[in-house]
Amino acid sequence: GLADRPIRWLVDDCAKFVAREKRRGNTYDGIIMDPPSYGRGPGGEIWKLEDCIYDLISQCEEVLSDTPLFFAVNSYTTGLSPAVMEYMLKTTLVPRFGGETSCDEIGLPVLMRPSYVLGGQNMIVAYTKADVIEYMGVITEHVDMDHPVLLDKYILGTECEVDAICDGENFLIPGIMEQVERTGVHSGDSICVYPAQHLTQAEIDTMVDYTGRFARELHVNGLVNVQYAVSNGKVYVIEVNPRSSRTVPYISKVTGVPMVDLAVRCCLGEKLADMGYGTGLHPNAPYVAVKVPVFSFEKLHGVDTQFGPEMKSTGEVLGIAPNYHDALLKGLIGAGYTFKTPGPASCCIFTVKDSDKPEFVDIAWKLKSMGYKLYGTSGTCAWLNKHMVPCNEVRNMSGESPNIVDLLQSGLVDYVFSTSAKGRDPKRDSVRLRRKAVELSIPCITAVDTANALVDCLRSDHSLENIPLVDIATLYHRK
């Protein structure tokens, strides 16, 4: 919440807190303030910490004169600008995606984003030059153009995330998290698995090495978050955030490493080696924990449900089990996904972009073998039939009745699988289809990897009745 508030509010809140605690007779050795690198002002404008850090310090000294104040910031924390990021990657010898000023130089597809992004807002993957032109209009309409629009090469791969604690010299990684959805889906909207299930030991060692380099180069005394992409065995860095992240509570809970406590002690000058949790990569827990995002699309009218670089989830649930598939099933059920035995007339609808069609053949075949009747729009239907998966054609949203809307309203559709090749225009048939599914409370899957995870759980003979309950407090000993 603080990222959306003017900087002086941080000072005022801090001063009020200290005054209230003093009245109660409580005193403190000091206060650690970790203000966001940038946020939105009262008029919606982007402000950067680097522009007001000295003003913030002077205000804090004035109102907190007798209480020591520790800032969890350093020379880089005030927002890793593209130039600073590029310099750091060169000095640490870590590879990254190519970044230029023209999509002709980079090569399509490209990730387009404003210089300063909150929650992936207005970040888009462009697959064609027409997409670049269309999306540039979207970005410039909503973003202050005092800062450039950035282009990065988009590489399809597995996305992983690391939260680490550093004392300025040594570092501790409680665990490496792997996302089910591939790169291009915001980490907050992706299913997240700990420990990582599909990384080689060499890839894990590389991430640990790179994270240590970043922590030392940034002179971190506290927390740092790094996001990686793995493609064809090579590890690339997506972004480095010298701050806490939304995954800290998750990874702390499932590993038993109290990250915030340790980070605070590092801020105050203690060393990780003296804290009892070791350094480097912490040993994996004896179970699997799956974090599944929760969405509120039924309350957000007009919002497209298609996954992408812009975050849309409003919460998350946690599934824990001895193995990955059981933990995933728990998480999906907790997030509101329904798992039911198909009836004699139960059906699924497929309408997917060309690049996803090959991967959806296996998904469709699995659903067909379970007893579902399959329907698809013209292109998807033709593709599935061509590859020996019986499918019935259904007219799209703008077609004559009976069309896909009538089928959705029939009460027979259990799942909709819809992926778009185009933008977010609410008048597009694909966007209208997904919104209609939301209105009718029909699960709508918009990513290949999510579809694979869902179908694997549907085919499993496990249910909540035969998956053991897990008491997380008994799985490790808190220190």
Language-model features, listed with the residues they occupy:
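Local beta-strand N-terminus motif with an aromatic residue
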Residues: T27-D29, L108, V413
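ATP-dependent carboxylate activation and anion-phosphoryl transfer catalytic cores
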Residues: G119, Y127-G343
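S-adenosyl-L-methionine
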Residues: G1-G30
